[in-house]
Amino acid sequence: MQQVPYGSVDRDKPLIRVPFTRLAVITVCLPLLGLVACIVLAMLYHYNDATYTHCQVPNYLPSISAAISLTPERYIWRFSIGLHSAPRFLVAAAYLSFYRGRFSRRLTEQLLSGFTFLLALSENVGLLLLTYVSSTETYSVHKSGFILFIGSSLFHMLCTCKLWSLIVKYSISSEEMMSYWFKLRLFLFNGGCCVLAVYFYRRHNTYCEEGITHASRCVSIWWCCPTWPST
Protein backbone atom coordinates (compact mmCIF):
# COMPACT_ATOMS: atom_id res chain seq x y z
CA MET A 1 0.00 0.00 0.00
CA GLN A 2 1.36 3.41 -0.93
CA GLN A 3 2.07 5.69 2.01
CA VAL A 4 0.89 9.28 1.67
CA PRO A 5 2.43 12.07 3.77
CA TYR A 6 0.08 13.46 6.40
CA GLY A 7 0.12 16.97 4.95
CA SER A 8 -0.22 15.85 1.35
CA VAL A 9 -3.04 17.22 -0.79
CA ASP A 10 -3.78 13.66 -1.96
CA ARG A 11 -5.04 12.76 1.51
CA ASP A 12 -8.00 15.12 1.04
CA LYS A 13 -9.10 13.67 -2.29
CA PRO A 14 -12.36 11.65 -2.22
CA LEU A 15 -11.95 7.89 -2.51
CA ILE A 16 -15.37 7.29 -4.06
CA ARG A 17 -17.63 9.56 -6.10
CA VAL A 18 -21.33 8.73 -6.33
CA PRO A 19 -23.65 10.97 -8.42
CA PHE A 20 -26.36 12.44 -6.21
CA THR A 21 -29.08 11.53 -8.71
CA ARG A 22 -28.01 7.89 -8.72
CA LEU A 23 -27.94 7.81 -4.92
CA ALA A 24 -31.45 9.32 -4.79
CA VAL A 25 -32.87 6.81 -7.29
CA ILE A 26 -31.35 3.84 -5.45
CA THR A 27 -32.59 5.19 -2.11
CA VAL A 28 -36.13 5.57 -3.44
CA CYS A 29 -36.22 2.18 -5.19
CA LEU A 30 -35.20 0.16 -2.12
CA PRO A 31 -38.44 0.59 -0.11
CA LEU A 32 -40.58 0.59 -3.25
CA LEU A 33 -39.22 -2.77 -4.41
CA GLY A 34 -39.38 -4.11 -0.85
CA LEU A 35 -43.01 -3.04 -0.54
CA VAL A 36 -43.99 -4.62 -3.85
CA ALA A 37 -42.24 -7.87 -2.88
CA CYS A 38 -43.99 -7.96 0.52
CA ILE A 39 -47.45 -7.32 -0.96
CA VAL A 40 -46.99 -9.94 -3.69
CA LEU A 41 -45.73 -12.57 -1.24
CA ALA A 42 -48.50 -11.76 1.24
CA MET A 43 -51.17 -12.17 -1.43
CA LEU A 44 -49.65 -15.39 -2.79
CA TYR A 45 -48.83 -17.21 0.44
CA HIS A 46 -50.63 -15.47 3.34
CA TYR A 47 -53.73 -14.03 1.72
CA ASN A 48 -56.18 -14.80 4.53
CA ASP A 49 -53.89 -13.52 7.28
CA ALA A 50 -52.87 -10.41 5.32
CA THR A 51 -56.44 -9.40 4.43
CA TYR A 52 -58.03 -10.16 7.80
CA THR A 53 -60.04 -7.27 9.29
CA HIS A 54 -61.20 -6.73 12.86
CA CYS A 55 -64.87 -6.79 11.82
CA GLN A 56 -64.33 -9.91 9.66
CA VAL A 57 -65.71 -8.51 6.41
CA PRO A 58 -64.32 -9.68 3.05
CA ASN A 59 -61.28 -7.76 1.86
CA TYR A 60 -59.18 -7.86 -1.30
CA LEU A 61 -55.84 -6.18 -0.57
CA PRO A 62 -53.48 -6.16 2.44
CA SER A 63 -52.39 -2.98 4.18
CA ILE A 64 -48.69 -2.17 4.56
CA SER A 65 -48.78 -3.04 8.26
CA ALA A 66 -50.38 -6.42 7.55
CA ALA A 67 -48.04 -7.23 4.66
CA ILE A 68 -44.83 -6.46 6.56
CA SER A 69 -45.87 -8.24 9.76
CA LEU A 70 -45.75 -11.72 8.23
CA THR A 71 -42.79 -14.04 7.62
CA PRO A 72 -40.64 -13.82 5.47
CA GLU A 73 -42.13 -10.49 4.36
CA ARG A 74 -41.04 -8.72 7.54
CA TYR A 75 -37.40 -9.66 6.93
CA ILE A 76 -37.49 -8.44 3.33
CA TRP A 77 -39.01 -5.14 4.46
CA ARG A 78 -36.53 -4.68 7.31
CA PHE A 79 -33.60 -5.45 5.02
CA SER A 80 -34.71 -2.93 2.38
CA ILE A 81 -35.45 -0.21 4.95
CA GLY A 82 -32.16 -0.89 6.74
CA LEU A 83 -30.29 -0.20 3.49
CA HIS A 84 -32.62 2.67 2.66
CA SER A 85 -32.34 4.59 5.94
CA ALA A 86 -28.58 5.26 5.97
CA PRO A 87 -28.56 7.25 2.69
CA ARG A 88 -31.60 9.20 3.91
CA PHE A 89 -29.64 10.48 6.89
CA LEU A 90 -26.76 11.43 4.57
CA VAL A 91 -29.14 13.18 2.17
CA ALA A 92 -30.71 15.12 5.05
CA ALA A 93 -27.26 16.32 6.15
CA ALA A 94 -26.34 17.20 2.56
CA TYR A 95 -29.50 19.27 2.14
CA LEU A 96 -28.85 21.08 5.43
CA SER A 97 -25.38 22.04 4.18
CA PHE A 98 -26.87 23.13 0.85
CA TYR A 99 -29.51 25.32 2.50
CA ARG A 100 -26.97 26.94 4.81
CA GLY A 101 -24.87 27.83 1.80
CA ARG A 102 -27.83 29.33 -0.09
CA PHE A 103 -29.25 31.21 2.92
CA SER A 104 -26.02 32.10 4.71
CA ARG A 105 -27.17 35.66 5.53
CA ARG A 106 -30.89 35.07 6.13
CA LEU A 107 -31.77 34.01 9.67
CA THR A 108 -35.39 32.99 9.04
CA GLU A 109 -34.45 30.63 6.22
CA GLN A 110 -31.57 29.26 8.29
CA LEU A 111 -34.00 28.40 11.09
CA LEU A 112 -36.44 26.85 8.62
CA SER A 113 -33.68 24.73 7.09
CA GLY A 114 -32.68 23.52 10.56
CA PHE A 115 -36.31 22.64 11.33
CA THR A 116 -36.57 20.81 8.00
CA PHE A 117 -33.48 18.81 8.93
CA LEU A 118 -35.04 17.82 12.27
CA LEU A 119 -38.21 16.75 10.45
CA ALA A 120 -36.12 14.58 8.13
CA LEU A 121 -34.50 12.90 11.13
CA SER A 122 -37.91 12.43 12.78
CA GLU A 123 -39.32 10.95 9.57
CA ASN A 124 -36.49 8.42 9.34
CA VAL A 125 -36.79 7.48 13.02
CA GLY A 126 -40.54 6.93 12.58
CA LEU A 127 -39.90 4.77 9.52
CA LEU A 128 -37.37 2.63 11.39
CA LEU A 129 -39.73 2.34 14.35
CA LEU A 130 -42.72 1.12 12.33
CA THR A 131 -40.41 -1.20 10.38
CA TYR A 132 -38.66 -2.99 13.22
CA VAL A 133 -41.70 -3.14 15.52
CA SER A 134 -44.49 -4.84 13.56
CA SER A 135 -48.20 -4.43 14.26
CA THR A 136 -48.42 -8.02 15.51
CA GLU A 137 -45.63 -7.48 18.06
CA THR A 138 -46.41 -4.18 19.80
CA TYR A 139 -49.28 -2.43 18.03
CA SER A 140 -49.14 0.83 20.02
CA VAL A 141 -45.44 1.33 19.23
CA HIS A 142 -45.97 0.43 15.56
CA LYS A 143 -48.90 2.85 15.35
CA SER A 144 -46.88 5.65 16.98
CA GLY A 145 -44.04 5.06 14.52
CA PHE A 146 -46.46 5.18 11.58
CA ILE A 147 -48.03 8.45 12.76
CA LEU A 148 -44.58 9.95 13.39
CA PHE A 149 -43.40 8.91 9.94
CA ILE A 150 -46.43 10.19 8.02
CA GLY A 151 -46.70 13.45 10.00
CA SER A 152 -42.99 14.24 9.79
CA SER A 153 -42.94 13.31 6.11
CA LEU A 154 -45.76 15.70 5.18
CA PHE A 155 -44.34 18.61 7.19
CA HIS A 156 -40.87 17.88 5.82
CA MET A 157 -42.25 18.05 2.28
CA LEU A 158 -44.07 21.28 3.07
CA CYS A 159 -40.97 22.96 4.51
CA THR A 160 -38.84 21.68 1.64
CA CYS A 161 -41.26 23.16 -0.91
CA LYS A 162 -41.19 26.49 0.96
CA LEU A 163 -37.38 26.59 0.95
CA TRP A 164 -37.23 25.74 -2.73
CA SER A 165 -39.83 28.36 -3.59
CA LEU A 166 -37.41 30.90 -2.08
CA ILE A 167 -34.49 29.39 -3.98
CA VAL A 168 -36.16 29.55 -7.40
CA LYS A 169 -37.42 33.06 -6.67
CA TYR A 170 -33.88 34.36 -7.05
CA SER A 171 -32.57 31.70 -9.44
CA ILE A 172 -32.52 31.42 -13.22
CA SER A 173 -31.50 27.75 -13.21
CA SER A 174 -33.95 25.59 -15.17
CA GLU A 175 -32.77 22.53 -13.22
CA GLU A 176 -33.65 24.12 -9.87
CA MET A 177 -37.01 25.26 -11.23
CA MET A 178 -37.80 21.73 -12.44
CA SER A 179 -36.74 20.29 -9.08
CA TYR A 180 -39.06 22.68 -7.24
CA TRP A 181 -42.09 21.85 -9.38
CA PHE A 182 -41.36 18.13 -9.08
CA LYS A 183 -41.22 18.42 -5.29
CA LEU A 184 -44.42 20.46 -5.18
CA ARG A 185 -46.37 17.98 -7.30
CA LEU A 186 -45.14 15.04 -5.23
CA PHE A 187 -46.13 16.85 -2.04
CA LEU A 188 -49.66 17.51 -3.32
CA PHE A 189 -50.02 13.94 -4.59
CA ASN A 190 -48.74 12.38 -1.38
CA GLY A 191 -50.85 14.71 0.76
CA GLY A 192 -53.94 13.80 -1.24
CA CYS A 193 -53.24 10.08 -0.80
CA CYS A 194 -52.85 10.55 2.96
CA VAL A 195 -56.17 12.40 3.16
CA LEU A 196 -57.89 9.60 1.23
CA ALA A 197 -56.24 6.99 3.47
CA VAL A 198 -57.56 8.71 6.61
CA TYR A 199 -61.04 9.04 5.08
CA PHE A 200 -61.25 5.37 4.08
CA TYR A 201 -59.77 4.29 7.43
CA ARG A 202 -62.44 6.14 9.40
CA ARG A 203 -65.18 4.97 7.05
CA HIS A 204 -64.06 1.35 7.28
CA ASN A 205 -63.92 1.45 11.09
CA THR A 206 -67.33 3.17 11.29
CA TYR A 207 -69.35 1.21 8.73
CA CYS A 208 -67.29 -1.98 8.27
CA GLU A 209 -68.13 -2.07 4.56
CA GLU A 210 -67.06 -5.03 2.51
CA GLY A 211 -64.01 -5.04 0.31
CA ILE A 212 -63.84 -1.82 -1.62
CA THR A 213 -63.52 0.66 1.26
CA HIS A 214 -60.68 -1.19 2.97
CA ALA A 215 -59.02 -1.92 -0.38
CA SER A 216 -59.15 1.77 -1.28
CA ARG A 217 -57.57 2.61 2.07
CA CYS A 218 -54.79 0.11 1.42
CA VAL A 219 -54.04 1.55 -2.02
CA SER A 220 -53.99 5.09 -0.58
CA ILE A 221 -51.59 4.07 2.19
CA TRP A 222 -49.33 2.30 -0.31
CA TRP A 223 -48.70 5.67 -1.97
CA CYS A 224 -47.71 7.09 1.43
CA CYS A 225 -44.77 4.68 1.57
CA PRO A 226 -41.27 6.22 1.83
CA THR A 227 -40.73 7.27 -1.77
CA TRP A 228 -40.16 11.02 -1.29
CA PRO A 229 -37.23 11.43 -3.71
CA SER A 230 -34.35 13.83 -3.20
CA THR A 231 -34.79 15.64 -6.50
UniProtKB/Swiss-Prot annotation:
Membrane topology value: Multi-pass membrane protein
Enzyme Commission number: 2.3.-.-
Keywords: Golgi apparatus, GPI-anchor biosynthesis, Membrane, Transferase, Transmembrane, Transmembrane helix
Paired cysteines (S-S): none
InterPro entries for the chain: Frag1/DRAM/Sfk1 (IPR019402), PGAP2 (IPR039545)
Stretches in topological domain Lumenal: 44-78, 132-146, 201-231
Protein name: Acyltransferase PGAP2
Species this protein is from: Danio rerio (Zebrafish)
Phylogenetic placement of the source organism: Eukaryota, Metazoa, Chordata, Craniata, Vertebrata
